């Protein structure tokens, strides 16, 4: 599984071309994962996630309230 990790506010975690920052963010939530900064979305994107990982989903987006 892969997807955008969420911050406490339910929003995607923003980044500006900083793969190491995103890798740390992903691994803080899911130890075996990897991550990078998705350039077009300017958001962190995680890979190698467990099937039950909760990631940002446009259909259940609660970002911004």
Curated annotation (Swiss-Prot):
Subcellular location: Secreted
Domain of life: Eukaryota
LCN-type CS-alpha/beta domain: residues covered: 1-64
PROSITE patterns in the record: LCN_CSAB
Record-linked InterPro entries: LCN-type_CS_alpha_beta_dom, Scorpion_toxin-like, Scorpion_toxin-like_sf, Scorpion_toxinL, Scorpion_toxinL/defensin
Tissues showing expression: Expressed by the venom gland.
GO CC terms of this entry: extracellular region
Keywords associated with the record: Disulfide bond, Ion channel impairing toxin, Neurotoxin, Secreted, Toxin, Voltage-gated sodium channel impairing toxin
Protein name, as recorded: Putative beta-neurotoxin RjAa4
Domain notes: Has the structural arrangement of an alpha-helix connected to antiparallel beta-sheets by disulfide bonds (CS-alpha/beta).
Listed GO MF terms: sodium channel inhibitor activity; toxin activity
Protein family according to the UniProt entry: Belongs to the long (4 C-C) scorpion toxin superfamily. Sodium channel inhibitor family. Beta subfamily.
The protein's role, per its UniProt record: Beta toxins bind voltage-independently at site-4 of sodium channels (Nav) and shift the voltage of activation toward more negative potentials thereby affecting sodium channel activation and promoting spontaneous and repetitive firing.
Record-level GO BP terms: defense response
Main subcellular location of this protein, as a coarse class: secreted
Gene3D superfamilies in the record: Knottin, scorpion toxin-like
Disulfide bonds: 11-63, 15-37, 22-44, 26-46
